[in-house]
Amino acid sequence: MNIKLFCFLSILISLTGLSLSGDDGNYPIDANGNRYSCGKLGENEFCLKVCKLHGVKRGYCYFFKCYCELLKDKDIQFFDAYKTYCKNSRI
């Protein structure tokens, strides 16, 4: 009985998108102040490149917008992330 309850709760939590680890992410914002749009849901190369521009290693398309896992609030805006990770820039 306990195993069935555990499995049911695990599936329920995964379907609702809740994270038990607390490792959340954010939607990155481009230089024009917009979220990056994407057409192919799930993992795709475009969102992965966008997330790398914002300083994180993992991202995917969620509700037709790129979502980056572990993206900190300070790196959501493109130019803020650019200043943080591109030390040789003059912006």
Swiss-Prot record:
The keyword Disulfide bond applies. Its main location: secreted. Expressed by the venom gland. Keywords: Disulfide bond, G-protein coupled receptor impairing toxin, Ion channel impairing toxin, Neurotoxin, Secreted, Signal, Toxin. Heterodimer of this alpha chain and a beta chain (AC D9U2A2). One of its GO terms (molecular function) is toxin activity. Residues 1-21 form the signal peptide. Residues 23-87 form the LCN-type CS-alpha/beta domain. The heterodimer LVP1 induces lipolysis in rat adipocytes. Induction of lipolysis by LVP1 appears to be mediated through the beta-2 adrenergic receptor pathway (ADRB2). The keyword Oxidoreductase does not apply. It holds the Pfam family Toxin_3. Has the structural arrangement of an alpha-helix connected to antiparallel beta-sheets by disulfide bonds (CS-alpha/beta). GO terms for cellular component: extracellular region. CDD domains: neurotoxins_LC_scorpion (cd23106). It is found in: Secreted. This is Lipolysis-activating peptide 1-alpha chain. Belongs to the long (3 C-C) scorpion toxin superfamily. Disulfide bonds join 38-61, 47-66, 51-68.
